Each structure stands twice: as C-alpha cells, then as structure tokens.
Amino acid sequence: MENAKITNLYNLDETIAKEYLSQFTYPWEALAGISDFIKELGPTLDPEIYEKRGEDIWVAKSATVFDSAYLHGPLIICEDAEIRQCAFIRGSAIVGKGSVVGNSTELKNVIIFNSVQVPHYNYVDRKSVV
C-alpha cells in the first residue's frame, strides 16, 4: 500500500487542494469531502483572480470556458484552465491551473491537478484524483 499513498503518487504543490489532501494518507480517503472543501475554499479566493459565476462556482478570470460548457457547483476552475465545447462538469470538481477539459468530457467529484489534460469524450467521475 506504500505506493498508493498520496505523498508517493502526487506532487501536492501542483494543486489548490494541497492543504486539504495533506490531511489524508490515501487518495480515496479525501474524495467524500471534495464538495465541502470547495464550499469552504471558494469564498476565500482572491476576487481579483476569481469571479463567482453561480452558486458555489468560482472561475479564474484568466480561464477560458466555452459558452456551450455546462458548469454545476461546487466547482473551482483555476487560472489559465480551459473548459472546451460541450464539457459537462456536474459538480464537486476542481480543475487545476493550466489544465484542459476537452470537448464533451464529463467531470464529477474530482480533483484535477495543474497542467493536466483530459482529452475530449472522456468520463472522469465517481471520485477521482487526477
């Protein structure tokens, strides 16, 4: 199980959820609380960098979100991220800095680290840390 520990799998400096994930040994331990974490963190985000776009939805002003993308909170989209056409974000999701969510990709209950590319037509759901 040593290889499955958060500290062995991930560079926590590459996520806005570093402090949150640091509380746990294994990734699956953190997944049930993603929604609550986002609801706590969102209101503390710098309004010069992030804008609130709906109930429990914070999007960095430098992020690109296509008009056809569906966003449902709780959700944080970090700086320079790109949410492409018809992406479907169902909530409890963090999209890291510089990450790309491809067209027609669905996300729910996930933490996407910085600079991750989730290609088009993917389904990242049911509690994932990518």
Where are these regions (language model features)?
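Structural signal for interior beta-strand "rungs" in well-ordered beta-sheet cores
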Residues: 51-130
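Terminal amphipathic alpha-helical/low-complexity segments used for targeting or macromolecular assembly
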Residues: 1-56, 61
